[in-house]
Amino acid sequence: MVSELTIKKWHFCQTLIQSIILLAVLILELVKQHFSLANKALTSWILILILAILSCLQFTLLKKKQNPHRRLVQFNYYWESFSITLSLQLTLYLIIIILNKYHILTNTFWIALATLYSLIMYIPMAKLALSKIKSTWGRILFPASIMFSLLLSAPDTFTYTKKIADWLIILNTSGFSGGIIFVIIMLIAMHNWGFQVPNWRISKRASKAIIGIILLFIIVKCLFNGFNASESWTSILTSWDFHLAKSITIPIFDSIKAGFAEEWLMRFCVLNLLLRYFKNYHNQILWAVLSDGLIFGLLHSTNFLNQSASATLQQMLGACCAGFVFAAIYLYSDSILISMGYHALYDTAMAITAGSLTMTSPSAFDWQETILLAIIDIIFAYFLISGSRKDTIEYNLRCRKL
């Protein structure tokens, strides 16, 4: 394990280099502009002052003794997690532009190198800022609402030109490489918050019959999500469309990213934090599953930006109830791999037929179908967390000290 002193040295070097680069680029750009002397000087000093303040705040993470319970200190941890994530990707972007301008090697080489480095460059932020957050709800909502989207979009910032290898465009624009970054960062944070690494194998207490039912449920649900083309109840079992969309590479990678990154966020991070929060509640498991599903549904509200309001509301309802099932499957099987696989297959089935994960405005029948599937999800999720299945879940939680 890398020592905190080494992490602090790493953070110091990154912060110093990024400050120098940002200031150098700022000065060069201002010199090029045709401002009056007074305006140019004023603008320069204001921007340099802002950058200096931001840099100084980032250096505060190097202080040896800080009271982690002080509100100002806690606020700084939130702020630095955000500002470091933003400034590092901006710095890499500017470096790539400069290297490209002077034709030093190829775009593909530098963007590939930047993508590789971005996999580890946020580690000091995770260790020195994000993992120091104390509030349980802060640990839940801050990564889910802000850090998730920031980190997933970070490598896409580098892909400012299409004059690079196709595989690099796919990895970065789909959010696949950003998803890997998020997994690494949250693994560090969760470790520092006292959580174990999630299991990949199925719990030895899980019934083979129940696992079989889960797998059957997954197959049927994915088939309906991707290939059922019915427009009325009379054709619900007879109308199927197995044609593939013309361009499916990026949607497939986007779906796989959703599978591993969103499940890492919602089931490994959020659900475990909720289980600890509700530990002394009478219905710990039920409250955790309900809260996890509701948060998962609410996170889809951001899709208002690229699709209709009715489509987003439909998606939020479906995601909320699907979240109950994802959580119940994870808790019963004790395997993050099953929930990841289900989520990835569910989205892939839709992506390869529609060519996108963006939804169109739903018809009256679409709403009826969504409500029916939501009810089925709720019933199945409750089945998995009740009766003898609940005993298995409680055993799994004891093994993970939850």
Functional labels for PLM-detected ranges:
Residues 301-317:
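Interfacial helix-loop-helix junctions of multi-pass membrane proteins
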